[in-house]
Amino acid sequence: MAHIVVMLPVYNEEARLERLLDRVRDALTGRVYRIVAVDDGSRDASAAILARRAADLPITTVTHPVNRGLAQTLLDGLRWAAEHCGNDDIVVTMDADDTHDPAYIAPLLEQIDAGADVAIASRFRPGSAVVGVPLHRRLFSYGVFALLRVFMPIHGVRDYACGYRAMRARLIREAVRRYGDRLLELRQWGFICTAELLWKLHRLGACCREVPFVLRYDYKEGVGHMPAGRTIAGYGLLVWKSWGSRRPTEPEVR
């Protein structure tokens, strides 16, 4: 049976982290799974919660002594998966602030079982909804991703940025091997990293599918949006780089 690895980027998530851990456990009852939390220099009780819950849950924590940002956190989680996961394992990435309901892990895994290499929880499918995001932000997102579908088309994909995904571990291993540190080049652009990762997995031939889901942004503590101008600039740079380098090359040997 394939192992399920749930990858959580954690940064000051004490308010909802414990609830999320319990919900992941409930969603994966009957499965062989492990939670891998990449703690990005949290200054609250997140690390203590993870250490305490490791007594009753299969939790591995990768720790950043200081905050390094979402992209570096995601990259380090992918490197962990490439090193430790078996070829048949499945890696699920999701936010640790409880905005991503673990109940959607099951339909994501169903898409993997049906032949997908990457299954995405999409905000832009019939039956999807976004709760707690103002209308103007939703319209802005629709416009940005419509442009990405024109300039960086991926068959079957409407949501390029949602980080709630299931991926085959062997695909992640190949991506880490082929791209090396260039797997996420735009690390300083924050949330752009999820679209960059998806595009590079697509360039490796990944079959991508989506399932509808409800994003509960009203559960989030604080604000996590990038300014609109920086978002546009980041996606513009991603489009430019995607056109400038259409095929991955072998990483340099050092």
Can you annotate each of these PLM segments?
Residues 22-32:
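Short, acidic, metal-binding catalytic loop of nucleotide-sugar glycosyltransferases
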Residues 8-22, 41:
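Active-site beta-to-alpha loop of glycosyltransferases that engages the nucleotide-sugar donor
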Residues 1-4, 15, 30, 107, ...:
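Hydrophobic helical membrane-anchoring modules
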Residues 60, 64-83, 88-90, 102-184, ...:
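Acceptor/aglycone-binding surface of glycosyltransferases and processive sugar-polymer synthases
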